[in-house]
Amino acid sequence: EKLLLKDIDEIAKRYSLKDHAKNPSYLYHNGKPLVTVWGVGFNDNRSYGLNEAEYIIDGLKSQGFSVMLGVPTQWRKLEGDTESDPRLHELIRKCDILMPWFVGRYNETTYPKYQKLVEEDIQWAKKNLVDYAPLVYPGFSWGNMKGKEHNSFIPRNKGSFLWKQLMGAIRAGA
């Protein structure tokens, strides 16, 4: 964790990340350069946990960064793909933006169930003063990574799948 924080500090200085005028192409949130900490709170026995994530988030915030946190789909209820530790919610509240993982969780037909989840997630985020960035995706296929014989895919449906997610997130207040 210390090495990561040292690296981001050096990168920020080298590339003037904290000076929007010198680095206008970098992404900023509320006037601060944005850094994402991804994969926090999953219950799949990762080699890091909430303690390490908190150390990194606290360090990034103290260095003047805005932080987006990438979390599991079921983060709010602390079930399913998410570890059951309520400290995850405390950690989310320390961040500026929340982005749950949804890739592969639904297709165009099953999306309405998840749209309701997104609506409730946005309500929680607003109540807890955390911005919410909905993760939307155009479709998915394992074909490029696992070969053509692998037939697990989520069709793009000529863009209608992506648009359904975008419109659902906007209507929910994202």
Spell out what each predicted region is.
Residues E1-A174:
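Glycan-processing catalytic domains of CAZymes
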